[in-house]
Amino acid sequence: MRGMPQRPPFLGCVVASTLLAASTLILRAQAPSGPPAWAYGVAPAGSQPAGRAAGGGSGATPADDGLPKHLEGSTQAFTLAQVRDGFNVADWYPGDHPEAPAIVMKGRAPSVRACGFCHLANGKGRPENAGISGLPVAYFVQQIADFRNDARKSAETRKTNTALMTAIAKPMTDDEIKAAAEYFAAIPSTPWIRVVETATVPRTRIAGGMFVPLDGAETEPIGARIIEVPEHPDRTDLRDPRSGFVAYAPVGSIKRGEALVITGGGRTLACGTCHGADLKGLGPVPGLAGRSPSYQVRQLYDMKAGTRRGPWSDLMKAVVANLTDDDLVAIGAYLASK
């Protein structure tokens, strides 16, 4: 109505979340059944992992031979030791991103690793961590605060880089956090993951929290999992920020996830209420479209399990309360496909 004050979009999200919280007192919440190992990049409890590899699908982490490596389309050259230096990011494609602040490319030795080392200079990230390009500044700053305050922990204790992120965040200065937040917010989030529905997946090794296909053509049933692997393992091993990932998902999961995301499916709140109709964010609320399904599922599970807390995470408690593990798989597959 003309002359009436307009309610900020984020306030509508808070109201909707509060109403949903009330409804969960009536619906019986689904108790967590244990962290889904696949989402955390660890072997299922009691199983024997196939092995470890850094890339290419076989053997241990290759030793540095001292020879410069090259990537197609790049004029840069780096040795493996340089690629693996957490305080001097191997910037393969400097023209792909804005001028980066020191905290992104160099970090601050000895305790603050460069943001771009794990999350890449363009912020696209990898399945074992998070894509952070395009995140709203306020959201980014709050998440670092949550790490510093020990509010963001993993429900899967073997997910060691969650503790590493906490250790990195604690000594960061406010200026460093602001510089990183503004830098990554200025880089749009673009497609990085190809979702393929299938009944079988390549057999894999676990490499630093990421699945890497074994050499050969061995396959296994996908089960109730999403298996996210590098499109080009050798390039991923060189931390190529242009080489994306393929996410294998169970047949039918995208359509089922669409129903849950768009309508809530009687179990939850429609994601677009808070994250925008296009799922690309709304004000300070982050976008979900096209982001890693492994990351998104483990975050939803952490919120459900109560290990990821903080002022904005608390708004998600009622949203995830009634979601089953199969629901999480479907939601992760659909969001990644957008």
Protein language model features and the residues they cover:
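N-terminal secretory signal peptides that target proteins for export/translocation
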Residues: 1-12
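Flexible coil segments in periplasmic/lumen-exposed cytochrome c-class electron-transfer proteins
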Residues: 30-113, 117, 152-270, 305-338
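Cys/His-rich metal-chelating microdomains
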Residues: 121, 277
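Extended intrinsically disordered, low-complexity coil regions enriched in Ser, Thr, Gly, Ala
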Residues: 133-162, 289-300, 305-313
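Short cysteine/histidine-rich zinc-coordinating motifs and their immediately flanking basic loops
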Residues: 126-132, 283-289
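Acidic, glycine-rich low-complexity segments
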Residues: 273
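Bacterial N-terminal signal peptides
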Residues: 12-24
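Sec/Tat signal peptide C-region and signal peptidase I cleavage site
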Residues: 25-29
